[in-house]
Amino acid sequence: MAEKLKGTTTVGIVCKDGVVLAADRRASLGNMVLSKEVTKVFQIDDHLALAGAGSVGDILSLVRLLRAEVKLYRAKVGREISVKALATLTSNILHGSRFMPYFGWFLIAGYDEKPALYSLDMAGGVTEDKFTAAGSGMELAFAVLEDGYKDDINVEEGVKLALKAIKIATRRDVFTGDGITLVTVTEEGYRELNREEIEALLK
C-alpha cells in the first residue's frame, strides 16, 4: 500500500490573476523508476484542473469520473461547475470510496469569479489553500513556496515559483524528476506550457 504512494511532487499556487499547477513526470514503484513521461496534471473543464500525487491508475480513474460528472453538470445546468463545487464533489467521491480508496493526494484548481485552489486527501478531507504541495518531495517544495509566496503574486511570477519548487525537489528527492508539467488556469481558461517554454524559464 505504501509503495503506491511513493514518488512525485505536485505544487499549486493561487495568484491574483489565476492558478498555477505543476508536477514532475517520474513514476516510481519502490526504488524503481517505471516511467519518465507520466502526466500528473489534467484538464477537467475549460477553467478547471486537477493534479495528483500517488497511484497513477487511481489518479486517471478519478480524472475520468470527474470529467464525466462535469459534462453531466453542464448538460443539466448549462454552465461550468464552480471550483468549490468541484472540490466538494471530489471530496464526496473520495469519502464514499474511503474503504477502497483512491490512493493519492489531489489538488483541485480553477477560475470562476476568482482563482481558487483546494487540496484533498484520500479520505475526502478538503482544505482551501493559497499554495500547497503534495507527494514525496512536498517538504522541499513547501520550503520554496513559503519563502517565495506573496499575496499579490501574478501568474508569471507563480509559474517561476512553481518551477523553482519542483526543481529543488528534483535535486533532493530521488522519487521526483524527469521533467515538469506546468499549467495555468486564468479567466481565459486552461493552458499547458510546452517543453520549450519550460526549458527557457528554467535557464
Curated annotation (Swiss-Prot):
It comes from the Archaea. Keywords: Autocatalytic cleavage, Cytoplasm, Hydrolase, Protease, Proteasome, Threonine protease, Zymogen. Signal peptide: none annotated. InterPro entries: Ntn_hydrolases_N (IPR029055), Pept_T1A_Psome_bsu_arc (IPR019983), Pept_T1A_subB (IPR000243), Proteasome_bsu_CS (IPR016050), Proteasome_sua/b (IPR001353), Proteasome_suB-type (IPR023333). It holds the Pfam family Proteasome. The formation of the proteasomal ATPase PAN-20S proteasome complex, via the docking of the C-termini of PAN into the intersubunit pockets in the alpha-rings, triggers opening of the gate for substrate entry. Interconversion between the open-gate and close-gate conformations leads to a dynamic regulation of the 20S proteasome proteolysis activity. It is found in: Cytoplasm. GO terms for biological process: proteasomal protein catabolic process. Its EC number is 3.4.25.1. The active site is at T8. PROSITE patterns: PROTEASOME_BETA_1, PROTEASOME_BETA_2. GO terms for cellular component: cytoplasm; proteasome core complex, beta-subunit complex. GO terms for molecular function: threonine-type endopeptidase activity. Residues 1-7 form a propeptide. It catalyses: Cleavage of peptide bonds with very broad specificity. Its main location: cytoplasm. The 20S proteasome core is composed of 14 alpha and 14 beta subunits that assemble into four stacked heptameric rings, resulting in a barrel-shaped structure. The two inner rings, each composed of seven catalytic beta subunits, are sandwiched by two outer rings, each composed of seven alpha subunits. The catalytic chamber with the active sites is on the inside of the barrel. Has a gated structure, the ends of the cylinder being occluded by the N-termini of the alpha-subunits. Is capped at one or both ends by the proteasome regulatory ATPase, PAN. Belongs to the peptidase T1B family. HAMAP family: Proteasome_B_A. Component of the proteasome core, a large protease complex with broad specificity involved in protein degradation. PANTHER family: ATP-DEPENDENT PROTEASE SUBUNIT HSLV, METALLOPROTEASE TLDD. This is Proteasome subunit beta 1. It comes from Thermococcus onnurineus (strain NA1).
